[in-house]
Amino acid sequence: MADPSFDIVSKVDTQEIDNAVNQTAKEIKTRFDFRDTGASAALSGESILLQANSEDRVKAVLDVLQEKFVKRGISLKSLEHGEPRQSGKEYKLTVTVQQGIADEKAKAIAKKIRADGPKGVQAQIQGDQLRVTGKKRDDLQRVIQLLKAEDFDVPLQFVNYR
């Protein structure tokens, strides 16, 4: 029988992202403080474009978007954005949704597992995810607890536990 293993991934459900953006756009249309500000939120691929006619209104739209993400159970760690930039009379802010674990984060997670994890547990980087194998299921449970206690600035999910 093969050794027990599980995968560490960082994925966000695209349907939930779409729902959160649609709820944000709907709330912007109905809220009085956004009236006549040209505020909008639109999803295009893996990024969300927020627009309004002032910098503080764009930041307010971002707050509404973050509130909707939290309500839909999406971690805010998966969002990456800069400062609003002016484009003509409008301010725009591009919010990128991170999918997968970046190489440097994957190396940091693997290093943490080797340093502080139980003996005999191995972590292999496979593209944008990690595969963790060990001799005992209890060791894998300890690795999961270790990683949940640590903050790697990416939302981690543990899947394919065998």
Curated annotation (Swiss-Prot):
Q: Which Pfam families does the entry link to?
A: DUF520
- Per the record, the domain of life is Bacteria
From the Swiss-Prot or TrEMBL record, give the protein name. Nucleotide-binding protein Franean1_6074
Q: Name one GO cellular component term.
A: cytosol
Keywords in alphabetical order: Nucleotide-binding
| UniProt family annotation | Belongs to the YajQ family.
Entry's Gene Ontology molecular function annotations: nucleotide binding
The reply on keyword Nucleotide-binding is yes
Query: What is the documented function of this protein?
Result: Nucleotide-binding protein.
